[in-house]
Amino acid sequence: MTLSLEQLSSRMRRGEDIPLRETAQVVLALSIPSILQQMVVTAMEYIDAAMVGHIGAEATAAIGIVSSSTWLLHGILVGLYTAFSIQIAQYLGADRQADARGVLRQAMLFNLILGLAAAGFGIGISRFLPGWLGADLSLQANASAYFAIWSAALPFTMAMGMYAAMLRATGDALTPGLISVLVCGLDVVFNFFLINPTRTLPLFGTRVTVWGAGLGVPGAALGTALSNVIGGLLALAILLLRDGPLCIRKPGSWKITRACLLNLWRVGAPLAAERAALSSAQVVLVRIVSGLGTVAIAANSLGVSAEGLCYMAGYGIQDAAIALIGQAVGANRKDMAKRFAWLCTGIGIGIMALSGMRLWVFAPALMGIFTADAAVIALGARVLRIEAFAEPMFGASIVASGAMQGAGDSTACFVLNLVSMWGIRLTLASFFAPRFGLAGVWGSMCCELCIRGLLFLFRLARGKWLEKGALA
């Protein structure tokens, strides 16, 4: 029988030597649901891209031009709320359940305040953003509408991600996965009716008229927004009704504490800065790609979606690594934290190496899912095959950074990502894009990801990441 994370944490606090087999079972028990959740999230991106892609390359390009900006805004929020889940994991590892519940209450207030502020900011800049990014005039109206609608749902999108991370910190990776499955299913349904106009479809040998709003690109944004609203409300309801260490109904203060703010600053600020550095680099990269034409913009956007099939496993294992290592550090078991870190990283490298092989083989078929445009398929398949070589080291950087974050070493993650993205990827891309087009951009990306993976492995091997801690 597989140990629960709560049982494992109790044994770690007692100083027991836990066999490698049991350790591996816990890693897999947390990783598999998280990987499945990432698969569902990626599937939702595929659905949006495929449904819009069949409208035409311009519709795909309209979403692609603002996609990096959605990553930037959402990424900053993710970086900040991840700091709350790291604190909760470490408090639970130290058996300080009341403190963990206090962090949860403060996180709820944070979600309300910052989520609304981010939504207002996104809506406010949506009119001007495509122009700032160099989009063609024919793309700007749809791109602006997509970003505004997506931004409006940010408080709920943030709630869904934040509360899912907190559930994983307690060892429950299944519930967030089930919420994601529901959200993906709703996204399919909403997109089906909102993107396309009213039309006649075959059904059991006859033809039926199916209503559609015919909104196109804004319909895709509205479908995603509505499904995220439902997912966020559901995640909140589960936390409010749940018993266990994070039972919010138990007596406790809603006051924002100095200790929580200090922990948020020490861990969350570097994480948010890291996400901002990565995502803003993607914005610059989109700016570089936007000068290569509509086909390149569409191929780049769809290629990023297709590549998600590979790295979703890495991010699923990263989620598990944050929870496991956070609890090990909280229990003052650095030996177990090291074991979890290398075990998770090794699994991540192996799975993403296999995913890279699949990406190489099925690149044209993957692009064909999203669009019928032959030029976009050909260019997208070419750059995906370039990127396939980087997947193992990309996996190393993703999972190793999760291990370091779980221990509170978020500043090093920020520095390594900043140097890698801005010092290597953008420098190479700006040089090679005019000479080799989109292939030059993705070749630069491949080179940078390999170097980034090696940097994170070196940091992990040195062991200094265990000296930080996340609790004030």
Where are these regions (language model features)?
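Transmembrane helical elements of multi-pass membrane transporters/channels
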Residues: A29-D48, I149, M160, S227-G231, ...
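N-terminal transmembrane alpha-helices
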Residues: I18-A50, H54-I55, S68-Q87, L112-A119, ...
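Residue-level hotspots within pore-lining transmembrane alpha-helices
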Residues: L36, V40, M44, L73-L77, ...
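Helix-terminus/linker motif at the lipid-water interface of multi-pass membrane proteins
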Residues: M39-A61, P130-L137, F193-P197, R207-L215, ...
